[in-house]
Amino acid sequence: MTTEMLVCDIETDGLLEQMTTIHCAVVKNYLTGKVTEYRPDEIEQFIRSLEGQVVIGHNWIGFDSAAIYQWCDMNDELFIGEFYPEPKMVIDTLVMSRLLNPDRERPQELPQRVGPHSLKAWGYRLGIYKGEYGEQDGAWDCFNEDMLAYCAQDVEVTTEVYKALCKEINDG
């Protein structure tokens, strides 16, 4: 199996404490640019696609990874006699942002409640916006194509955040 660098995001029906499902996921091969979208009936396939790969995600360690393990626990019949699929390595752009510049300033046009290391803040910084999906009541209750498009946009923003952070490292 060839190791690939995959920029990933998922959308769920709630935060970890309330989550009951992963609605969708989007994966972008960092080197080729190929994007793969996963709908609700393809989540197992998505999780298996991460096996042995380098995964890049924003808040992957704090949320996405934990949500995937929680989903696997809720669907353990799919993994009888095997370990849950695991990436070879995880690169979390939220962690990178905090480590490289703990005092990073929040873009002025954002409300105080938006953290300076958030994907939304990075989107403003880079001129690649996350989108507005999810601000309406019930937005995360059921899967829909707008949610998938929002997830895909998050992957695009995360890709550019990773590039910007690598540039910060290289520029010293």
Question: Language-model segments: which ranges?
Answer:
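RNA/tRNA-interacting regions in translation and RNA-turnover enzymes
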Residues: 6-7, 48, 158
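A general structural motif
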Residues: 2-3, 51-54
